[in-house]
Structure formats: C-alpha cells, structure tokens
Regions:
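Ser/Thr-rich low-complexity repeats and stalk/linker segments
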Residues: 221-309
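Signal-peptide-cleaved, periplasmic/extracellular N-terminal interaction regions immediately downstream
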Residues: 42, 48-217, 221
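Bacterial signal peptide processing site
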Residues: 29-32
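C-terminal motif of bacterial Sec signal peptides marking the signal peptidase cleavage site
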Residues: 24-27
Length: 309
C-alpha cells in the first residue's frame, strides 16, 4: 500500500472513530432527546428554530401531580382567566391529550429552549359561551416543537399553535360540543393543563372554518357582515400569501384583497384585513386561501355570509 493510500485509510478510520464517539456521548447525555409527535409536517423551519411537527401525543397513564391539584379546582364557564408568572418558558415542547370518564384533557408542555421549564409562564385563556373555540395566549413563547393536530372524535377536535400578532404565541382548541373547563398549573416540569367537560350537545357557534392550509376565525359561516368587514384567521400557505375574496349572489367579485400572515414555515401565521364593502344586499360568499402552485385551483376556506343592509 502507498503512503498516500495508507494516510487516507488512517484518516477515514479516525473520522469514523470520532463520529462513533460523538454518537455515544449524545446518547449518554440525552442530547438527541426531543419531543415526538404523531407525524412530521411537510414544511421546513429555518436553521435557528426547531422544526415543528403535526400531531398530539397521547398521555400515558395518569399525569403525575394532578390528583391533588384537580381536587381543589372546579370546572367553570368564565370568559377570561389568567395565571402563571414570569417569562422564562419560551418554548412549547409538546401538546398531549387524554380521555377520562367524564372529561377530556389537553396538556401543553413548556420549556426554556430545548429543556423543560420549571414554572408556568404568564398565560391568558379566553372562551365564549356556546362557542367551539378556546384560546390560550402564551406571550413568552417564541418557538414551538408542535404546530397543530387532531385529537379524536369526542369532545376535543383539533388544535393549532399560532404566532400572535402581539408577540408570543397562542393555542386554539376546537371543541365539538358546549363545555366547561378547568385549568391546572403544574411545576417542575412546567405544564399547563386544560380539562374540558361537556355540558350539552349543540353549539351556538361552531368552531372556525378550515380548508387547505387556512383557518378562518372571523367571520364564521352564515354570519351577518357589515361595512367595514374585518377578516381574521391564520394559515400555512406558501410564502405567507393569502387572498380574501367576497362575491355577490351571482358570483361576481365585489372585493379582493391580498394579505400576508406573520409566519408559515415554522407554525401557523396570523393574518387580519379590514375591507370596505361595496353596496350589495342578500347573501354572499367569502373565500380566504391561495391558489394551488401547480394548476392555480383555489385552496382554502369558503363560507356563506349575508349583509346587514
């Protein structure tokens, strides 16, 4: 063997040995441990943020420490509730889900960077009576390992992690039936637990409409709209591009507006547009979404609305 060939072989062997050593050390110190969800999304995140996944992990067995806490917490129908302290927890590590005899549970695991946080940061919960939407605002959350997913066919339907226009992130939970809720704050590691208890069968207002990579929060289907019209929601459409179109009963376009969301590659991005409505009466159709990159066909949400005039 030539000296050149021997030298290359020796270098290759050293590189392989170094790689094996790094791999073993990573396993020993848990460096490769990251929250896992059901399936990975098709989108890619930038190099300075973790790649978010789609799906809710199931809670295995009972949630440690919740027994004593839940015994002193009651289910309520409050419109607004808040709690937590500080802003050290800046990451949503996972969203987990469990079904109990008379309620369903969602758990937000919170972290500082890649590691579990010790205390629950400041949060605000908003809920409307008879509405299929409950929102948890986390102003300190800057990144997330999970962007959304489905729960099941019972009370809880799905969730979305959205970058807030005011900074931080919020989690929207979509619910199929009227409900009451209770919130539990768990420390070391930090977890925010929301339990949902059904209270009826039919909602006064259904959850926001969903289609393609778009969620339309306002207006809801069959809403009465007036001038000016505020359209809000969130999406994961390519390049954060969204088109809002309102047509009259004959299908003629009354107004069209392009609006960008504040994220799309990492998690759901919020958008909002205020539109001056031209004169029209009767029913209309509101479409929010984008065109398919290959054939231009519409992908998004389409809901009926009516004018108040």
């Amino acid at each position: 063997m030539s000296i050149r060939g021997w030298g290359l072989g020796r270098i290759s062997a050293l590189l392989l040995l170094s790689l094996l050593t790094v791999t073993l050390l990573a396993g020993c110190f848990g460096l490769d441990r990251a929250p896992r969800s059901v399936r990975v999304s098709d989108s890619t995140a930038s190099s300075d943020v973790p790649e978010s996944t789609v799906g809710a992990s199931h809670i295995d067995g009972g949630l440690a420490g919740t027994g004593d806490t839940s015994a002193h917490a009651t289910f309520v129908e409050k419109a607004v509730e808040s709690g937590g302290s500080g802003n050290d927890a800046d990451t949503m590590l996972a969203v987990r889900y469990g079904v109990h005899d008379d309620y369903e549970r969602a758990v937000i695991d919170l972290g500082t960077g890649e590691r579990p946080a010790g205390t629950v940061p400041e949060w605000t919960l908003t809920s409307s009576d008879g509405d299929g939407l409950l929102r948890v605002d986390l102003p300190s959350a800057m990144t997330t390992y999970v962007s959304g997913g489905k729960f099941g066919e019972g009370l809880l339907g799905s969730f979305h992690v959205v970058r807030s226009p005011d900074g931080g992130m919020f989690v929207d939970f979509f619910v199929h039936q009227p409900y009451r809720y209770r919130v539990l704050q768990m420390q070391d590691p930090a977890r925010l637990v929301v339990d949902f208890e059904p209270t009826g069968v039919n909602l006064d207002e259904p959850p926001p409409a969903q289609g393609g990579n778009t969620v339309l929060v306002d207006p809801r289907p069959n809403s009465t709209v007036s001038d000016p019209l505020t359209v809000s929601g969130y999406s994961r459409n390519p390049e954060a591009a969204n088109t809002v179109t309102l047509t009259d009963p004959r299908g003629e376009v009354l107004v069209r507006r392009n609006v960008r969301s504040n994220d799309w590659s990492h998690t759901w991005g919020y958008f909002e547009a205020t539109i001056d409505l031209p004169p029209f009466s009767g029913k209309g159709t509101l479409k929010v979404g984008t065109g398919n990159a290959r054939d231009g066909t519409f992908e998004g949400v389409e809901v009926p609305v009516r004018t108040s005039r």
